[in-house]
Amino acid sequence: MTIYEKNIQTLSKYYPGMDYNIDKAKHDLKENYTIIEEKSKDGMPVLKVKKDGHCCYLGGKRNAQKPTEEWLKAQGDLCDGYTYIMLGIGNIGYLRELIEHVDFRLNIIIYEPSIQIFLKSLEWIDLEKGMKKHLIIFWVEGIGLMTLDRIGSVLDKVMRLENLNKVQLFILPNYDILFEKKCESLVKKCEDTAFENRVNYNTAVKFSNIDSINVMKNAKYLCTAYKTIQLYKTIPFDTTGIVVAAGPS
């Protein structure tokens, strides 16, 4: 079994139906660029993308491994629940560093705009260990119902206000050039999510005292309110009554 086949099985285990959605996406593929696999001078696989007459490398042609190692060292002290929102998986070295060298359980959300790049990356890394160790979500444009417009539900869960100081958005090299609009859109979605959570928190704090005061002021009406007294004496005190009601009242 190849690494690619093993990864498809692993993904299907955690996300049922992923294998079917990947096969369908491959069949319906309509991407207007070419993916070329090369080797860097240090022997690591590197992707070159040809798009609109231009070529971009997603990893270093001379030394592909060292930049990812230095990146991990620069991350400092991580902790359980730290979240990476990554744009791209074209340089698999960044994900590999997190899987192999971070023992804390991380949340790793990877948005990949290209099906071709995603499928090629599945040939280079065994995901089984990483999926057991961390929460890894692949959000690949065009596979199943996954689109950038629908990633908000994922961002809402990992970008709660109490976790914002443990969230990092990381855009892999040259993705801002190859997928400029997707990059700008993801950045804006993250900013909007963080802002909305902050506003909701501030609103809750500001009105928490007012809510308490309102409850105390209106407590005296509970005993005489219509909904409180409408069943009074309707059911005899010495009889068991069953009230069937719909709604919070």
What are these regions (language model features)?
Residues 1-242, 248-249:
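N-terminal donor/sugar-recognition subdomains of glycan-related enzymes
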